[in-house]
UniProtKB/Swiss-Prot annotation:
Residues 1-10, 21-35 form a propeptide. There is a cross-link at residues 11-20 (Cyclopeptide (Ile-Pro)). Keywords: Toxin. Belongs to the MSDIN fungal toxin family. InterPro entries: Amanitin/phalloidin. Processed by the macrocyclase-peptidase enzyme POPB to yield a toxic cyclic decapeptide. POPB first removes 10 residues from the N-terminus. Conformational trapping of the remaining peptide forces the enzyme to release this intermediate rather than proceed to macrocyclization. The enzyme rebinds the remaining peptide in a different conformation and catalyzes macrocyclization of the N-terminal 10 residues. It comes from the Eukaryota. Signal peptide: none annotated. GO terms for molecular function: toxin activity. Probable toxin that belongs to the MSDIN-like toxin family responsible for a large number of food poisoning cases and deaths. This is MSDIN-like toxin proprotein 1.
Length: 35
């Protein structure tokens, strides 16, 4: 069980870093389209 957590932790951290970047990129694209 501990091995599963050890492999999931890095994935969760990466997702936590990537998702906000993707959201900000989407917002920029939407604002560009509106303008």
């Amino acid at each position: 069980m501990s091995d599963i957590n050890a492999t999931r932790l890095p994935i969760i951290i990466v997702l936590g870093l990537i998702i906000p970047l993707c959201v900000s990129d989407i917002e920029m694209i939407l604002t560009r389209g509106e303008r």
